Amino acid sequence: MTVNADSRSVAAQATWRSLPAAQQPEYPDAEALRDVIAELESYPPLVFAGECDQLRARMAAVARGEAFVLQGGDCAESFDAVSAEHIRAKLKTLLQMGAVLTYAASVPVVKVGRIAGQYSKPRSKPTETRDGVTLPTYRGDSVNGFDFTEAARIPDPERLKRMYHASASTLNLVRAFTTGGYADLRQVHAWNQDFVKSSPSGQRYEQLAREIDNALNFMRACGTDPAEFQTVEFFSSHEALLLDYESALTRVDSRTGQLYDVSGHMVWIGERTRQLDHAHIEFASRIRNPIGIKLGPSTTAEEALQYIERLDPEREPGRLTFIVRMGADKIRDKLPELVEKVTASGATVAWITDPMHGNTYEAASGHKTRRFDDVLDEVKGFFEVHKSLGTHPGGIHVELTGDDVTECVGGGDEIFVDDLHQRYETACDPRLNRSQSLDLAFLVAEMYRDQ
């Protein structure tokens, strides 16, 4: 179990406060922020240290080439979307993707949601201007409001408490869905069969769906009905961006005396906050959770090795995951050196592709969007690099929703640029909709089989 930190451990994990911290809100009322932090420090953990250790063990299998990671969810969660309907749709999509990938890869698929904490977003500009009016940029529901008004855009520390309660509600629903029969493998496969029948690309996926069906029928005929068919292991993750929040939810594990960030099972450090001598890396170095680092096209092999020294000095498989976000046009050139140098160092890290963030562009309509073909091509490049080097393509990290939005162009249902306005609902970056997400899962399954 975890307990509140004592004064000595608080000092140990708060060493980040003396370092530069990028992308932090400028709260107008420092005393109000201190009061909120003190209250958060008294709240129960959202996850337990033992669960974080369990995910570390699963990620160790990924790093050794014995498992595959499916990590996905909203670009930025919103408080308004904390409903059974939205959470169920997102979870359903991830479960369907996981079932396809598990069968095709013939290895366990570790399912990790961008969920129950992804309420904050780093931004490229501190302000936004519309019709001559300049206001602070929207930084996620945990910081300020989406409405373009002066009042809404003022950072409000009370939103940190709302993030905690929204995350708790979401985790409660996820735990209920994943253990209460909703995640039964046979039900998930039935959903996939419906998708194959209705998808314009369904004919391409029909053989794989039929193979899964035959395997399930064979096990049923043998009288096999393991408990694992009825429940699923599911973990939460988010970007550790708002350090006041993450620090307030850092606790001591009573078993070991180690520090854990109990806001989620896994946290990652983003491309804009991964400076080696800054606060985010320092904070991550103090906690025992599995840690991800986003690596963009500017990342050097030397930097990657320094992240290993700072965050995984004991070289423990499962501790560190590199989430690569290069762009479809750069991954084949930039990734090989990183993988080669890291592998040569003897470190055993998990490699995951994020094919979303390097492929964003602005359509003529003004909508930020992504081409499904670019997303797919970056995944292909990721697999090609690992195949050529004899290393393991450990997983995919995708921004997605279970809803039928129109935010990314392409896919089996062929969304066009002119369609973007129809259901463009994201609070920040464009997400794959349910159909595009399942298209991607079937196509990644084909790639894995070709490895």
Where would I find each of the regions flagged by the language model?
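Active-site-facing alpha/beta catalytic cores
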Residues: A76-E77, V82-G327, R370, E378, ...
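Short coil-to-beta-strand
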Residues: G65-E66, W351-T353
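Short flexible/disordered coil segments
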Residues: I352-H357, H386-K387, G411-T426
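Short acidic, glycine/serine/threonine-rich loops at helix termini
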Residues: K121-K125, D194-K197, D333-L335, Y361-S365, ...
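Non-transmembrane, aqueous-exposed alpha-helical and coiled segments at domain scale
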Residues: A304-Y307, P313, R319-A350, H357-T406
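Long, contiguous, compositionally biased segments that the model treats as domain-scale units
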Residues: T2-N144
